[in-house]
Amino acid sequence: MIVQNIEITTLSNGVRVVSETVPYVQSVSVGLWVGVGSRDETDPVRGITHFIEHMLFKGTPTRSARTIAEEIESRGGMLNAFTDKEYTCYYAKALSEHVEIVMDVLTDMLAHSLLDPEEIAREKNVVLEEIKRYKDQPEDTVHDIFAQTLWKNHPLGRPIIGTSHTVSSLTREHIEEYMQTHYTPDKIVVSVAGNVTHAEVVELANRFLGSISGPPYKRRARKPQPSGNSKTVRRRTEQVHFCLGGQGFSQKDDDRWVLTIIDSVLGGNMSSRLFQEIREKRGLAYAIGSYAVSYTEGGIFAVHGGTSPQTFSQVLELTTKELENVRKNNLTEDEVMKSKTQVRGALVLSLENMSSRMMRMGRSMIHFGRVIPLEDILQKINAVTHDDIDRVANQLFDGSTLTLAAIGPLEKDAI
């Protein structure tokens, strides 16, 4: 039995506080989660969620940008943030004795950022350089091209970073209006894991966030529909980078755990079928693997890799062959058992890291409004059967519905 001391409190203004007390460690990981991501953006302000994440590090009435970093780092801690398609997270890790200053700094950033026009102009240049750097990395951009092609015209298909045009056009008024709409108490989750009590966390959250206000915001639900299209981007690179896949499952669909097992067998690790066949046995690629991602209303499954233009067709053929093999239910009992053990082990091992515990709770609160017990997840993984795998593989791996995205020195009709 895995014992987790998780408690949840909702403040009077709607801010949710979740904590896990782990008395045998000396650290604490704190995350401020906001239930807003790139999927919530309109076309004219694409990239604004990510841009706001940058701006919240640029100073408050009582702290400069440098002071924000120094107050955490001078105590041996670390401070960072990330933007996803459905949420944004500002987080820090430090010794548990510094939990008060960590909460003070993070909440000050969230609630009192200056959004100085000069800083906005300067940070635009930073993000524009980030976009250029990103475009120079085809092994990364191919994933966005894949999502855009798979989910054409759906906000989940948009790149998180935005475009050079939309980022250049952002104004302080855009940012303030967006934050007033989305950075509301009902969308905020304070997630804390480490050597700290729930009462301490609630007191700090009340002190620093208890007075913020704003009307609740309800995201418009719209399930993404797969296009079945493919796309080639011609570029003078040494390799062809590709993603082949399609629709996965939402966060609330238990078939996501069936797909997790399939993913592990196909390309989730070094002992997977694709890694062994394409890299180890044939030496056709350095990077080859697969992934499954779940969102509120849908999900993605994809095989990704990079190979020379001359061997791209062969790698693609081997990949589709393995997908078809899984459709024909040729996974062995041993493969399924090992995959279940691997997935369960990775989940349990993640509990040794306070940041992983904090992130698991934060994501669960954003998606479900509660923390799904780890025992429940482990039971769902154990319950996956060969019939489940056969059913899901037949549903997802139909070659006529798959989407392929590729970047490299290819002709337009290469796929």
List each model region and its residues.
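Catalytic cores of enzymes that engage adenine nucleotides and/or redox cofactors via long glycine-rich
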Residues: P224-S227, E277
